């Protein structure tokens, strides 16, 4: 091909006069963007040579003098006399606007840098440019300034290589900035290397001593994979189609984010404003996914109207087309205008992806579900925006009806209690200090937002009320400066249900109002679960553990256990109380708890085979007055039907029991009991009961089933009075770790949660003893 690339291939269209007068028309601007565009134009010429199969290495060098050198190992710009211009072709290419091989279809099937246009514009806007060509065994050289020849064209040496080297100095009379930016250039060269996997681009910046080499054999498939920083829903999908002299290459994948990252290129030129190639891809993709939803989604899911934005949520894609004569909107090629490209790309995308979906149903379903989720999220976001666009007036009319607002309008001194239940809300409203304390009752458990999509979340009345009351919006409309209360206090019953509601609310805040947590606005109230009364003594106790510890401390007074100090006994019985609590939990899950306790306290028995273990268990049951009616033994388990005071129970002893987190925790706690080496003449649980019974003599213990059982005065003095209350501030030290924790414990996946509990049960060391 080399001998066919000569002077006759360079077509001349018109002169160069206007470039210096209106540089913006040719390079976009005279700022940092236009400056780098100069380098791109020269590099694009080398890329054209590579696309035509004549070049595989491009070297770009920024010098300490402020110039840029671009070299390639292509065929070299023709140097023979031009047939119509009566001057060397190299001179024509560099001094005549619209003179280039691009305009001769036989030279380049496709071309990115408008060959000749780009180089001549660069020449016109440079205070100096030196062109060196290796061709025909010779080295040719010519110098220019401001687009004009300043040295004779001539041979300066011999060479067996071929290629072109352009060195230019941007004109500081034209450009506002003449300092090249390494990172901007490296990003562009990296893109070019992805788009042209056979090319190596070596980039060196002598000003800072940096050097990088870009070469990606995986091409644009590797590009989308490298762009993805999240969990991928699909592997990279790639296709390449040639039709009507147009080459279409597309690579895409989906991840679990909510944004789209679509990059498009025409003849290696990035088209930041898109164009007909992007439109064609989007059209084809939307059709494929819409068709797949129509054929495979449930009837209820089909009701969701899918838009193009929905199918591109979580999409990372590269669309690269090679077009013989592209029409760009604007000289800087920001947008492709060639209308015939759209149907070609649309057809190619539709046909390939339709086939791909048929052959890869798992990934197709993942993409379908992602689009359906996006559609629901879009509707929800619309609803959320409408909610937050309500009047910002603080008059009661714009706030939730159940909200009892405070009198203060100063957020820094205002606090809002999110209270579990209407009845508790009533007590809180009466007991509060209304000058700075607002009350918002929440009915029942709010939604687990980790398992629900945004549309469902925002249908929740409780969540709507919170968003409106806080005043700071949600999602994209969130504005922390509009928060109406700087303390948001979650106040729930002091039981398991209350803890669950706390967790649900914290999950919501972490996922959708994270800045409230990050800025220290979320707190947990600490209401008591028990009230202990004896004579004139009245003690509020936070939970079961606090009650048990208080009963132990009170009950050992007046009791005498010979040889045992009071503090030792107190610590010992606290461990026994923890052991009893675990045994109660085990009893809820496994039958014949007496046998399970016996094995925990005699762990050496478990080390034998099942026949030996069964023999020991049988003897133990007989001493307890229990009969074994039937049994079955193999190497994996023991099964026996035992007549106990509870009736007929099936006893199952196998690996599932021994590895259960509660069994392992009970064994760990009992080892701590044994380590204390205290001896009594009765069972340790009976000793604990004796102490508790002593503490309960003459006392009444009230358990608050809910906050609503407290009268307003009690609620104020235990939970709401700033001078005595205890609040826990919620903080997040490690956002990624917190994200993983919420996902693990509140998410849809059961297996990871189970695996975590089983894996960590043996590490339980958190007992406060």
Curated annotation (Swiss-Prot):
Q: Which cofactor does it need?
A: Mg(2+); Mn(2+); Ca(2+)
Where is the protein localized? Cytoplasm
Record-given protein name: DNA gyrase subunit B
The gene is gyrB
A matching Pfam family: HATPase_c
What is the documented function of this protein?
A type II topoisomerase that negatively supercoils closed circular double-stranded (ds) DNA in an ATP-dependent manner to modulate DNA topology and maintain chromosomes in an underwound state. Negative supercoiling favors strand separation, and DNA replication, transcription, recombination and repair, all of which involve strand separation. Also able to catalyze the interconversion of other topological isomers of dsDNA rings, including catenanes and knotted rings. Type II topoisomerases break and join 2 DNA strands simultaneously in an ATP-dependent manner.
Q: Which reaction does it catalyse?
A: ATP-dependent breakage, passage and rejoining of double-stranded DNA
- According to UniProt, residues marked as the site described as Interaction with DNA are 445, 448
Positions of Mg(2+) 1 binding = 420, 493
| Highest taxon above the source species | Bacteria
* Positions of Mg(2+) 2 binding: 493, 495
Q: Which GO terms describe its cellular component?
A: chromosome; cytoplasm
Q: Name one GO molecular function term.
A: ATP binding
Assembly and oligomerization = Heterotetramer, composed of two GyrA and two GyrB chains. In the heterotetramer, GyrA contains the active site tyrosine that forms a transient covalent intermediate with DNA, while GyrB binds cofactors and catalyzes ATP hydrolysis.
GO BP annotation list: DNA topological change; DNA-templated DNA replication
The record ties this protein, via HAMAP family, to:
GyrB
Q: Write down the top EC class of this protein.
A: isomerase
Tell me the cofactor note.
Binds two Mg(2+) per subunit. The magnesium ions form salt bridges with both the protein and the DNA. Can also accept other divalent metal cations, such as Mn(2+) or Ca(2+).
Residue ranges occupied by any Toprim domain in the UniProt entry:
414-528
- Chief localization: cytoplasm
Entries under InterPro entries matching the protein: DNA_gyrase_B_C, GyrB, HATPase_C_sf, Ribosomal_Su5_D2-typ_SF, Ribsml_uS5_D2-typ_fold_subgr, Topo_IIA, Topo_IIA-like_dom_sf, Topo_IIA_B
Alphabetized, the UniProt keywords read: ATP-binding, Cytoplasm, DNA-binding, Isomerase, Magnesium, Metal-binding, Nucleotide-binding, Topoisomerase
The EC number(s) given in the record are 5.6.2.2
Any additional notes? Few gyrases are as efficient as E.coli at forming negative supercoils. Not all organisms have 2 type II topoisomerases; in organisms with a single type II topoisomerase this enzyme also has to decatenate newly replicated chromosomes.
Please give the family membership noted in the entry.
Belongs to the type II topoisomerase GyrB family.
């Amino acid at each position: 091909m080399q001998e066919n690339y000569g002077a006759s291939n360079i077509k001349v269209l018109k002169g160069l006069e206007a470039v210096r007068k209106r540089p913006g028309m040719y390079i976009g601007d005279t700022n940092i963007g236009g400056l780098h565009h100069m380098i791109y134009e020269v590099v694009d010429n080398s890329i054209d040579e590579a696309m035509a199969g004549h070049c595989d290495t491009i070297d770009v060098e920024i010098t300490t003098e402020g110039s840029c050198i671009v070299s390639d190992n292509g065929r070299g710009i023709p140097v023979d006399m031009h047939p119509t211009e009566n001057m060397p072709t190299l001179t024509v290419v560099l001094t005549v606007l619209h003179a280039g091989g691009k305009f001769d279809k036989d030279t380049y099937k496709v071309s990115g840098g408008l060959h000749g246009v780009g180089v001549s514009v660069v020449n016109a806007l440079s205070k100096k440019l030196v062109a060196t060509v290796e061709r025909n065994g010779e080295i040719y050289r010519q110098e220019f300034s401001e687009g004009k020849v300043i040295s004779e064209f001539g041979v300066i040496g011999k060479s067996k290589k071929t290629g072109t080297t352009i060195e230019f100095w941007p004109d500081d009379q034209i450009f506002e900035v003449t300092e090249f930016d390494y990172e901007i250039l490296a990003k562009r060269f990296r893109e070019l290397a992805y788009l042209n996997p056979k090319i190596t681009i070596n980039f060196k910046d002598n000003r800072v001593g940096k050097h990088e080499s870009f070469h990606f054999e995986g091409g644009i498939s590797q590009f989308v994979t490298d762009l993805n920083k999240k969990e991928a829903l699909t592997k990279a999908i790639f296709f390449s189609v040639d039709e009507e002299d147009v080459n279409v290459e597309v690579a895409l994948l989906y991840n679990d984010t909510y944004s789209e990252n679509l990059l498009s290129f025409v003849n290696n030129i990035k088209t930041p404003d898109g164009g007909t190639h992007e439109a064609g891809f989007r059209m084809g993709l939307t059709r494929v996914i819409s068709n797949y939803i129509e054929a495979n989604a449930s009837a209820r899911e089909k009701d969701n109207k899918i838009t193009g934005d929905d199918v591109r949520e979580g999409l990372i894609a590269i669309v690269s087309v090679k077009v013989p004569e592209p029409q760009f909107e604007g000289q800087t090629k920001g947008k492709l205008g060639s209308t015939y490209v759209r149907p070609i790309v649309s057809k190619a995308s539709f046909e390939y992806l339709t086939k791909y979906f048929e052959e890869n149903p798992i990934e197709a379903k993942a993409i379908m579900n992602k689009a359906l989720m996006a559609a629901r999220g879009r509707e929800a976001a619309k609803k959320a925006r409408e909610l937050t666009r309500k009047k910002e007036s603080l008059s009661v009319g714009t706030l939730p009806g159940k909200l009892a607002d405070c009198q203060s309008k100063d957020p820094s001194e205002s606090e809002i209690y999110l209270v579990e239940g209407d009845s508790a809300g009533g007590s809180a409203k009466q007991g509060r200090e209304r000058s700075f304390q607002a009350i918002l009752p929440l009915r029942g458990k709010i939604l687990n937002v980790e398992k629900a999509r945004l549309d469902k979340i925002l249908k929740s009345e409780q969540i709507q009320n919170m968003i409106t009351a806080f005043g700071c919006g949600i999602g994209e409309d969130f504005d922390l400066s509009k928060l109406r209360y700087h303390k948001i206090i979650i106040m729930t019953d002091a039981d398991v249900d209350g803890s669950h509601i706390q967790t649900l609310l914290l999950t919501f805040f972490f996922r959708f109002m994270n800045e409230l947590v990050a800025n220290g606005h979320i707190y947990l109230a600490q209401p008591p679960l028990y009230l202990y009364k004896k004579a004139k003594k009245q003690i509020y106790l936070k939970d079961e553990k606090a009650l048990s510890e208080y009963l132990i401390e009170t009950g050992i007074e007046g009791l005498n256990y010979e040889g045992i100090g009071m503090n030792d006994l107190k610590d010992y019985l606290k461990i026994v109380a923890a052991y009893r609590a675990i045994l109660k939990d085990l009893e809820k899950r496994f039958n014949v708890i007496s046998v399970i306790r016996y094995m925990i306290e005699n762990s050496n028995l478990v080390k034998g085979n099942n026949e030996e273990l069964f023999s020991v268990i049988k003897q133990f049951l007989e001493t307890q007055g229990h009969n074994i009616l039937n049994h079955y033994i193999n190497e994996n388990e023991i099964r026996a039907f035992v007549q106990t005071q509870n009736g007929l129970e099936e006893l199952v002893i196998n690996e599932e029991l021994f590895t259960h987190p509660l069994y392992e925790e009970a064994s760990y706690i009992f080892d701590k009991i044994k380590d204390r080496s205290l001896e009594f003449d009765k069972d340790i649980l009976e000793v604990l009961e004796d102490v508790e019974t002593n503490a309960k003599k003459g006392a009444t213990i009230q358990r608050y089933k809910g906050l609503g059982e407290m009268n307003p005065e009690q609620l104020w003095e235990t939970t709401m009075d700033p001078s005595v209350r205890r609040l826990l501030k919620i903080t997040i030290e490690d956002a990624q770790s917190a994200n993983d924790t919420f996902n693990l414990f509140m998410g849809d996946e059961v297996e990871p949660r189970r695996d975590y509990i089983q894996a960590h049960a043996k590490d339980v060391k958190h007992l406060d003893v």
